[in-house]
C-alpha cells in the first residue's frame, strides 16, 4: 500500500498533468475554429475546379493531344500513394486511422500484383508506415516548421509528384487524407490525382444546363495548365482538411484526458483520506491504550 506521502505526490502529479491537458484542449479549440473555416472555404473552390476540369475534358480527345496527366500512361502497374497525416501526436486515433486506411489499400494492390510506392506527408504517417513498409517509402515531406499551411506548401508537393510522373516513376497516384466532418468525426478518404479524375460533372443551374462552351486557345492547352494546378489545389484542400481533423481529434482527446485526470484525482484523494483516517484512528487507539495502562 502506498504511503500518504506517495499518494500526495501522485495527486500533485496528476493535477499538474490535468492543467496541461486542459490548456492543450483550449489551444486546440482555438486553432480548430480557424482550421475549420479554412477547410470549409477551400471545398467549393476545389470541387468547382474539378467540375471545370471535367467539362473541358469532355471537349478533348486523345487525337487532340490530351495531356498525359489526364490520359495516363496506358498502364496500371505502378501506384504511388500520397499519405497525408499530422506532424504531432496526442490526437487520439487520427493518424493511425489514416495510416490503417492506406495500409489496407497497399495490401489490396499488392494482392493484385501491383507495384506500390509511398510518399508520406507528415511525420506521424511516416513513423507508422515505416514499421511495415519501409522499403516502399520513396519520398517523405514534413511540415513541422510550417506555422500555417499555405498553397505554396501544397504546390511544392504537387510539383514533386508531377516531376516523378514525368520521370516515369509511377502510373497512378492516389491521395490519402482525412475529411473533416465534425470534432468527433474524421473520415479517411482516397482521391485519385493522376490520371486526373474526370468523373461526372456537377449539376449545373437550369440557366446553364444547355450552355455551349468555347475555349481559347484550345481545350488541350487549357488542360495542360489547369491539371497541374488542380493537383496542387486538391492537395491543399487535403492538407487543410487534415489540420481541421487533427485539431478536432486533439480537442476531443485532451477533453477525455482532462476528465480522466479528474476521476483519478478523486480516487487518489479518497484513498489518501481513508488512509489518513485509518492512521489517525490507530494513533488515537494507541494514546487511549497508553492512558489506560497508566
From Swiss-Prot:
GO molecular function, one term: ATP binding
PANTHER family documented for this protein: ATP SYNTHASE GAMMA CHAIN, ATP SYNTHASE SUBUNIT GAMMA, MITOCHONDRIAL
Main function: Produces ATP from ADP in the presence of a proton gradient across the membrane. The gamma chain is believed to be important in regulating ATPase activity and the flow of protons through the CF(0) complex.
Organism: Rhizobium leguminosarum bv. trifolii (strain WSM2304)
Biological process terms in GO annotation: proton motive force-driven plasma membrane ATP synthesis
Gene label: atpG
Keyword annotations from UniProtKB, A to Z: ATP synthesis, Cell inner membrane, Cell membrane, CF(1), Hydrogen ion transport, Ion transport, Membrane, Transport
Top-level taxon of origin: Bacteria
Subunit structure: F-type ATPases have 2 components, CF(1) - the catalytic core - and CF(0) - the membrane proton channel. CF(1) has five subunits: alpha(3), beta(3), gamma(1), delta(1), epsilon(1). CF(0) has three main subunits: a, b and c.
Pfam families hit by this protein: ATP-synt (PF00231)
Annotated localization: Cell inner membrane
Coiled-coil spans in chain: none
Membrane association type: Peripheral membrane protein
Full protein name: ATP synthase gamma chain
GO annotation, cellular component aspect: plasma membrane; proton-transporting ATP synthase complex
Stored Gene3D superfamilies: 3.40.1380.10, ATP synthase, gamma subunit, helix hairpin domain (1.10.287.80)
Record family assignment: Belongs to the ATPase gamma chain family.
